[in-house]
Structures are given as C-alpha cells and as structure tokens.
C-alpha cells in the first residue's frame, strides 16, 4: 500500500473519531487543537512532531512509531506508549510532555532517562519495566499517592 507523506505541515482543528489510519508518515509536523478519539493507527510514523492542545483518547497502534514527539497542553487518555516505540538503539519516542493531563496511560519497556514529568497531571497510569531516573521530589509525591 502506498504511504501518505506529510512534512513540515501545520495541521489544525482536525477531529478524527473511530477511524483507522494506515500508512501515514508525518515528519516535522505540528498538530494544533486536534482530536483523535478511538482511532487505530497501522504502519504510521510521527517523527519530530509537536502536538499542542490536542485530545488523544484510546489510541490503538500496530506497526507504528513515534520519534522525538512533544506534547503540550494535551489530554492523553488510554495510550500504551510502549507500543509506539521507535526502532533504533538511540531513538526516543517522547521528547517532552508538558502541562498535559494523562489518564490510563501505560509506559512500559521504555528508556525515560532525563525525562521530566513535572508539570503534568497523571492519574491511574502504569509505569513498568522502565529505565528512568525519578527526581527525589517526584519520588516523595509518588509515595504519598
């Protein structure tokens, strides 16, 4: 199947619900005020993309990857991030998650060294089998919760 390719695009105000996206590649794209709800992505790549004020809810992924993504002021609900890991020894799925609301997320089998979750609201999420340096301040908060 032929891949649909986007590079350097700004994608605004798109609402995609209960759809399957196959063979899309987004390089250096910005997503602003977009919504992806109950979507399935198959053989898709998001590389060096930024998401601002987006809702991503119950995303299902197969053979897809995110590389060096940034999320700011987003609602990220029901995402299994381990299923979106990029190939390559030094590739990073997430560059930054800032001022976001995360609920029912699963972070597993990921290298999150040097990653900072401060400034985000995280509820009912799982962190498993990670390589991660948790700052002492966050360790204290996690013990209280």
Regions found by a protein language model. Give the residues of each.
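Tandem repeat scaffolds
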Residues: 1-145
